[in-house]
Amino acid sequence: MDDATFLASYDPAAFPPLAVAVDVVPLTFHTGALHVLLTKRAEHPARGRLALPGTFVHAQEELGAAAQRALRDKAGLNTPVRQFQAFGAVDRDPRMRIVSIGYMAVVDAGTMMAATASAVASELLAVTGDSVRNAAGRRTALPFDHGDILARALSDLRRDLDRDDWAFGLLPNTFSLRELQALHEAIRGQTLNKPAFRKRLIESGRLE
């Protein structure tokens, strides 16, 4: 039997149904702190709750394109995304078996604030540690496994902070060393020694 014959008789219905989705973690650096953009769910389950913007992947759609579509349609953002992990716990969604691919977007504050103003069903919440808090400082629980997805995105952001320039997308086109150090402190969750921070940047070749 060759491939053509096999595929002609192949029955996808012989396997349990499985859906693929994407969930995006849109981050920004605003008022000296990391923030994540969340959108209010319009449908059940978890209707009315704040969640990461996400969507199901269309049959003929690339994963990255689906992530950008979710950002554009639900958050009003047109920005590059970076894939960081798949999330496939059997019980992560009550509807059916859904595997979600996690993506991250880093956006400067000006762009993010404009998107928040135009997207009425979105809110910008501060990130503290691996959790989010509302304007009153109360911790906000996210539906599904979105809390785990956010935590993984933040872990990857911290890991790659000194490896590449991805996190620079959280800053405007021009910024001071003070702003850059404040960003690093917000991401790491700790105060950094100013001379040591600048020395490390110079030694890495990213600052002259």
Language-model segments: what does each one mean?
Residues 24, 83, 103-105:
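A structural signal for short, well-ordered beta-strand segments
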Residues 15, 88-98:
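Acidic pyrophosphate-coordinating catalytic loop
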Residues 19, 78, 96-100:
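Short connector loops at helix/strand junctions that flank enzyme active sites
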